[in-house]
Regions:
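Short coil/turn segments
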Residues: 4-8, 63-64, 72-74, 121-122
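Acidic, polar ligand-binding/catalytic clefts
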Residues: 5, 84, 88, 93-133
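Extended ligand-binding regions for polar small-molecule ligands
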Residues: 1-40, 81-89
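A structural signal for short loop-to-beta-strand junctions that line the ligand-binding cleft
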Residues: 1-3, 45-49, 79, 127-133
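Hydrophobic/proline-rich hinge and linker segments of small-molecule sensing/allosteric domains
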Residues: 3-5, 55-62, 132-133
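Charged, alpha-helical scaffolding/interaction elements associated with membrane systems
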Residues: 24, 72, 110-112
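Disordered inhibitory propeptide/activation segment of secreted metzincin zinc metalloprotease zymogens
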Residues: 30-58
Length: 133
């Protein structure tokens, strides 16, 4: 996942949420469903999740199954489920915006999206433009 350069506050929140989700097995279940085929379903938000901490916008390119793709007019996949689980931990409402892959970093850098996730490889060139978790 990538963040606007210098947005350490959001990146730190993500890293803390990721740590919790790894420890409680949520990430393993997501991988089990989409990659390994060992789980019956992907991530589902708890009914009582509090989303009072605002909105979180994810930029993606939903053409990279199993990481992000459309199913019944909804973006699903590993990255989408990871993002939902993180947003739930942060108490935020998630919006996922589908766009061309080459537009993701620009959307994050300009503030049109809070973060990007699209099976993106971390490269030296990209590390000059955005920060990665």
């Amino acid at each position: 996942m990538c963040f606007k350069k210098g947005n350490t506050e959001l990146e730190d929140k993500f890293n803390a949420a990721i740590k919790e989700l790894k420890e409680d097995g949520t990430f393993d279940k997501i991988i089990g469903y989409y990659i390994d085929g060992t789980e019956d379903k992907g991530y589902e938000s708890p009914a009582d999740v509090d989303r009072s901490n605002g909105k979180l916008v994810m930029a993606t390119n939903a053409a990279f199954e199993p990481y992000e793709y459309y199913e019944n007019d909804k973006i699903v996949g590993v990255d989408a489920d990871f993002a939902k689980a993180i947003a739930d931990k942060l108490g935020m409402e998630l919006t996922i915006n589908d766009m061309e892959f080459d537009s993701i970093i620009a959307a994050v850098d300009s503030g049109k999206a809070d973060f990007g996730a699209a099976g993106m490889t971390v490269t030296d060139e990209r590390k000059q433009q955005v920060d990665f978790s």
